[in-house]
UniProtKB/Swiss-Prot annotation:
Location of the transit peptide in the chain: 1-24
Family note: Belongs to the SDHAF2 family.
Biological role: Plays an essential role in the assembly of succinate dehydrogenase (SDH), an enzyme complex (also referred to as respiratory complex II) that is a component of both the tricarboxylic acid (TCA) cycle and the mitochondrial electron transport chain, and which couples the oxidation of succinate to fumarate with the reduction of ubiquinone (coenzyme Q) to ubiquinol. Required for flavinylation (covalent attachment of FAD) of the flavoprotein subunit of the SDH catalytic dimer.
Protein name listed in UniProt: Succinate dehydrogenase assembly factor 2-B, mitochondrial
Biological process terms in GO annotation: mitochondrial electron transport, succinate to ubiquinone; mitochondrial respiratory chain complex II assembly; protein-FAD linkage; tricarboxylic acid cycle
GO CC list: mitochondrial matrix; mitochondrion
InterPro entries: SDH, SDH_sf, SDHAF2
Assembly notes: Interacts with the flavoprotein subunit within the SDH catalytic dimer.
Natural source organism: Drosophila melanogaster
Keywords: Chaperone, Mitochondrion, Transit peptide
Length: 156
């Protein structure tokens, strides 16, 4: 069947159905609005309520680290899942209570995960309240000087 199709279309222009042509044309129109490498980042609408993350002052350090390990692996976007889970596997066990609180504030105090990604990759400047020792450590981790493959999350 495929051989017949190839033979029958050689030397002829392949005609797309009318519906496919209009869909293709509408997709071509959309490409003129962005340029390659441009970040499309819109502000949140003012009517969108962003809930405050609850502070847990009485949470034991080990429980907090376990929660952060889980939250670093389940971000909802693969890019941050890979970056944060490998970062936590490497550094979280050595964090003291203050560093753990800084990391908790970093991943739970931000309302948009793309912000964490852009700050960690130095695509956008990090705001002063998040420019901490932990963010600098994360930025170094993202640079991947050791050239470690990070195509999957580390085992638990």
């Amino acid at each position: 069947m495929l051989r017949q199709f190839i033979v029958s279309t050689v030397g002829r222009r392949l005609q797309l159905p009318m519906m496919a042509q209009s869909r293709l044309a509408s997709n071509l129109d959309k490409t003129e609005y962005t340029t390659p490498g441009e970040i499309v980042d819109y502000d949140d609408p003012p009517h969108l309520p962003v809930p405050e993350y609850p502070v847990r002052p009485d949470e034991p350090l080990e429980t907090r680290k376990q929660r952060l390990l889980y939250q670093s692996r389940k971000r909802g976007m693969l890019e941050n899942d890979l970056l944060l889970s490998t970062f936590v596997a490497k550094h979280l066990k050595d964090f003291n209570a203050e560093q753990t609180a800084e990391y908790d504030q970093l991943i739970n105090g931000v309302s948009n995960d793309w912000d964490i990604f852009y700050w960690a990759t130095d695509t956008k400047p990090t705001p002063p309240q998040f420019d901490t020792e932990i963010m600098r450590l994360l930025k170094e981790h993202v640079k991947n000087h050791e050239k470690v493959q990070r195509i999957r999350q580390p085992d638990l």
